[in-house]
Amino acid sequence: MAAPVNKAPRDADLWSLHEKMLAQPLKDNDVEVYNIIKKESNRQRVGLELIASENFASRAVLEALGSCLNNKYSEGYPGQRYYGGTEFIDELEVLCQKRALQVYGLDPECWGVNVQPYSGSPANFAVYTALVEPHGRIMGLDLPDGGHLTHGFMTDKKKISATSIFFESMPYKVNPDTGYINYDQLEENARLFHPRLIIAGTSCYSRNLDYARLRKIADDNGAYLMADMAHISGLVAAGVVPSPFEHCHVVSTTTHKTLRGCRAGMIFYRKGVRSVDPKTGKETRYNLESLINSAVFPGLQGGPHNHAIAGVAVALKQAMTPEFRAYQRQVVANCRALAEALMGLGYRVVTGGSDNHLILVDLRSKGTDGGRAEKVLEACSIACNKNTCPGDKSALRPSGLRLGTPALTSRGLLEEDFRKVAHFIHRGIELTLQIQDAVGVKATLKEFMEKLAGAEEHQRAVTALRAEVESFATLFPLPGLPGF
C-alpha cells in the first residue's frame, strides 16, 4: 500500500508554521522590508521634507489604512455590489461620501462624489473618459508652466501622457515674464480650438486660479470646466484659498497632499437641474453622476481599495476641525515666510510670492539649475524637487526648485523655523555653485555628482551642513505610527 505523499505530522508542522507566519510582526517575518521601512522612517525624521506634494498622515489615518478592510473585495457601489458580505463596506463608503460633501460645504442635492479612484491620475482619466469622447479636445496648463502630467502633456516630438495619446490636447501657458497664467491667450486659443473640457489645475503654480474667468471661457466654448485641486484640497477645505466648487462642473483631487490623508482620489460632480428653458420652463438635468461612476467602475477600475477609503474618511473628519483650519493657515503663513526669506537672500521666486503652500525658486540668476541643487540639498538631508520655470528651453535641465510647506508644518514648524530652513537651502545652493565652479558649468549631471562624491572639501561641507540640518529637524516630532 502506497504511503501518503504528505505525512500527517509534517502537515501539522507546516500548518503550525503557516499560523506563525500569519501572526508574526513584520520585524520578525520579513526583516529586509522592515529594515527598509525603518531606514525610510529615519530619513523622514532627521530630514527636512520640502516636496510640495508630500505630507505626514496622522496615526489614525495610517491605522485605518492598515486595517482588516484591506481584506475585503467589493466591486460596484453601495447597494449594488457584485460580491456578498459588503454591508459594512457600504456603510463606510457612504460615510466617506457624506464627509467629503460636508467638508466642502456642498449640498447633496446639487453635488455627488465618487470616492473609489485609486489616486489622482486615475481620477482625472476617469473624468476625461466620462466627458470627452475618444480624441476629443482638452485644454490644461502646460507641464513646464506648472500644470500636471495628466493634463495632456506632450512635447514637439512625442505624446507623453496617456491623456495626450487618447485625447487631443492643447496646453495653455503662463506669461514667461510674470509667471502668471495668460488668461487672454487662453481665451483666444479656446475660441480657435473648441475644447470639450478645460482643466483648472496645477502642480507647481503659487497663485490662486481665476475660476470665474475660466468658467466664462468654458461656457463661451460649450466646454466643461474641471478643477484638479489635488495640491490645494486641504487649503480649500479650510477656506484659506478660493473654492473651485462655485464655478466648476467637476472637481477632482488626491487626498494625501494638503488634505493629509492616505493615497487615494475623489471626483466631485454636479447633479440636479443644469438649466431651465426660459420659454417652456423645461428643466435640463446633469447626467454627470452616471457618466463618471461608470467610467470609474467598470470602465477603468475593479474593486475599490476599502482600506484607503477608510483612511480618506478619517482624514475628512479631521479636516472639519478648527485645528485643521489653523494648520492650513499656518501652511500658507510658513510658505510666505519661506518666500520672503529666500528673496531676502537674493533669490528670484516666480510670481514674486505665493497664495498657497508652494513656491518655485528660479535659479537662472544664480547660474545653476534645479537638478544640481536638488542633488546637493538631498545629500544635506533636505528633500525638494527640480522643476521647470517659465521660459525654460529644456525640461532635461530645469531651472527651478519647487518648495512646499505642508509636511514640515505638520511637524510643527512656524515662520521663524522656515526662515532658518531658508538659510539651510541657501548654504546648499552656495555649495552647489562651488562644486559647479570646480567641475565646469558645461559638465553633465553625472560629472557633477562624481565631483560632489569624490572631492574631500565638498564632502566635508556636506557633512557639516547635514549635521546641522538633522540636529534641527529632530527637534520636531514626526507624526504617524509609533515604531515607524
Swiss-Prot record:
CDD domains: SHMT (cd00378). GO terms for cellular component: cytosol; mitochondrion; nucleoplasm. GO terms for biological process: cellular response to tetrahydrofolate; folic acid metabolic process; glycine biosynthetic process from serine; glycine metabolic process; L-serine catabolic process; L-serine metabolic process; protein homotetramerization; purine nucleobase biosynthetic process. The modification N6-(pyridoxal phosphate)lysine is found at residue 257. It catalyses: (6R)-5,10-methylene-5,6,7,8-tetrahydrofolate + glycine + H2O = (6S)-5,6,7,8-tetrahydrofolate + L-serine. It is found in: Cytoplasm. Gene3D superfamilies: Aspartate Aminotransferase, domain 1 (3.90.1150.10), Type I PLP-dependent aspartate aminotransferase-like (Major domain) (3.40.640.10). GO terms for molecular function: glycine hydroxymethyltransferase activity; mRNA 5'-UTR binding; mRNA regulatory element binding translation repressor activity; protein homodimerization activity; pyridoxal phosphate binding; serine binding. Keywords: Acetylation, Cytoplasm, One-carbon metabolism, Pyridoxal phosphate, Transferase. InterPro entries: PyrdxlP-dep_Trfase (IPR015424), PyrdxlP-dep_Trfase_major (IPR015421), PyrdxlP-dep_Trfase_small (IPR015422), Ser_HO-MeTrfase (IPR001085), Ser_HO-MeTrfase-like (IPR049943), Ser_HO-MeTrfase_PLP_BS (IPR019798), SHMT-like_dom (IPR039429). Coiled coil: none annotated. Its EC number is 2.1.2.1. Pathway: One-carbon metabolism; tetrahydrofolate interconversion. It holds the Pfam family SHMT. PROSITE patterns: SHMT. Transmembrane segments: none annotated. Its main location: cytoplasm. PANTHER family: SERINE HYDROXYMETHYLTRANSFERASE (PTHR11680), SERINE HYDROXYMETHYLTRANSFERASE, CYTOSOLIC (PTHR11680:SF59). HAMAP family: SHMT. Interconversion of serine and glycine. Belongs to the SHMT family. This is Serine hydroxymethyltransferase, cytosolic. It comes from Ovis aries.
